[in-house]
Amino acid sequence: MSPTVMIVEDDPATRRLYRFLLTNSGYVVLEAEDGMAALERLATTPCDVIITDMNMPRMGGIEMVRTLRQQQSTVHVIMVTAFGTPDTEKHAYRAGVNEYLTKPFDFEELEQRVQIFFAHKQIP
């Protein structure tokens, strides 16, 4: 099965950019416009990594991650946010986020984190 990444982002232009870059890197890319849509999609289509924004309509990234962890999901979650305060970062990690990036960031850093996750996943 191909490595699958879900992008959870309410800004369509940002979703398109992530999709373009990740697809060109060889990943299967799923998309959702907010946490609620992501949970609905994940109910039928699993993924390996979720890249999620924090603040979105209906359900934000932190609430989505809390719900996933309550469902015993072990999916790897990378949160990206423009609200990069130490308290926000702690809040995200307590909710179950695996990695945290503050916008703006270099896409190469995000791609490297995804690559490292898949490299470690391959190790028996």
Per-segment meaning from a language model:
Residues 56:
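Receiver (REC) domain active-site loop signature in two-component systems and cognate sites
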Residues 34-37, 60-63:
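Acidic catalytic/metal-coordinating carboxylates
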Residues 16-24:
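Charged docking surfaces used in two-component/phosphorelay signaling
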